[in-house]
Amino acid sequence: MNTIDMLELEQMKKNIPPFKPGDTVKVHVKIVEGDKSRIQAFQGVVIARQNGGIRESFTVRKISNGIGVERVFPLHSPSLDAIEVITRGHVRRAKLYYLRKLRGKAARIREKKYVAAH
């Protein structure tokens, strides 16, 4: 491993839950306004994950007042406070950009079913 990889490995966050495109997540973001800071939640469906390592980012889409809103979050950013996985979705694509064209019930994602071990 070279020195750049070692430096990046030190700066990467360790407490990131595993999530994939199709999962519904709640992202807690630190917002600084002047001298005050607060945490704002952004809940939506993960439609893409890009790159890898310290440069990794993911895109979350939600519908707010009938308008689609997408935000791209750097995965290892210090402004991310926490990521919660709300539901696991079952999709057959890595990039869910087709959801941008769908409205209403057509934009639903099937929930992944788990079989309990005996």
Swiss-Prot record:
Organism superkingdom: Bacteria
Q: Does the keyword Ribonucleoprotein apply?
A: yes
Asked if Metal-binding is a keyword of the record, the answer is no
Q: Which SUPFAM superfamilies does this UniProt record tie to the protein?
A: Translation proteins SH3-like domain
GO cellular component annotations of the record: cytosolic large ribosomal subunit
Query: What is one process in the GO biological process aspect for this record?
Result: translation
Q: Which InterPro entries match?
A: Ribosomal_bL19 (IPR001857), Ribosomal_bL19_CS (IPR018257), Ribosomal_bL19_sf (IPR038657), Translation_prot_SH3-like_sf (IPR008991)
Q: Which UniProt keywords apply?
A: Ribonucleoprotein, Ribosomal protein
Q: Which GO terms describe its molecular function?
A: structural constituent of ribosome
What family, per the record?
A: Belongs to the bacterial ribosomal protein bL19 family.
Q: What does this protein do?
A: This protein is located at the 30S-50S ribosomal subunit interface and may play a role in the structure and function of the aminoacyl-tRNA binding site.
Protein name as annotated: Large ribosomal subunit protein bL19
Source organism (scientific name): Geobacter metallireducens (strain ATCC 53774 / DSM 7210 / GS-15)
